[in-house]
Amino acid sequence: MAEAGAGGLSETVTETTVTVTTEPENRSLTIKLRKRKPEKKVEWSSDTVDNEHMGRRSSKCCCIYEKPRAFGESSTESDEDEEEGCGHTHCVRGHRKGRRPTTPGPTPTTPPQPPDPSQPPPGPMQH
């Protein structure tokens, strides 16, 4: 406290210190580590068959065909004349060597049907 003598003015200074103590909170943080997902990629094994005979192991076809062999038959014997494809009905490209895919149309087992004379010919409709 400070006082001034002659003029009768006095000044009072009060300092207040507030100490707040808080109890530590019981917070916890849990971090879970997860493995990275492996990248999806094709890995060819050393015994993968190159069914397109192009010297590489990639294929635009739907599958890699391994021809079934009889018990005891050597895997090194190959008969190119008996190549028949993968047998999957969903494979529209085929797996036959030297053949290109054809445009969609009637299947070779069904002959094309002649047009029905009772039906109007296909073309633009006229009203």
Swiss-Prot record:
Keyword NAD: no
Keywords: Acetylation, Phosphoprotein, Protein phosphatase inhibitor, Transferase, Ubl conjugation, Ubl conjugation pathway
A Gene Ontology cellular-component term: cytoplasm
Region annotation Atypical RING finger domain 1: where it falls in the sequence: 53-63
Pathway the protein takes part in: Protein modification; protein ubiquitination
Residues with PTM Phosphoserine: S74, S75, S78
The enzyme's E.C. designation: 2.3.2.27
Residues modified to N-acetylalanine: A2
GO BP terms in the entry: defense response to Gram-positive bacterium; negative regulation of cytokine production; protein ubiquitination; ubiquitin-dependent protein catabolic process
General function of this protein: Atypical E3 ubiquitin-protein ligase which ubiquitinates TLR2 at 'Lys-754' leading to its degradation by the proteasome. Plays a role in regulating inflammatory cytokine release and gram-positive bacterial clearance by functioning, in part, through the ubiquitination and degradation of TLR2. Inhibitor of protein phosphatase 1.
Protein name (record): E3 ubiquitin-protein ligase PPP1R11
Originating organism: Rattus norvegicus (Rat)
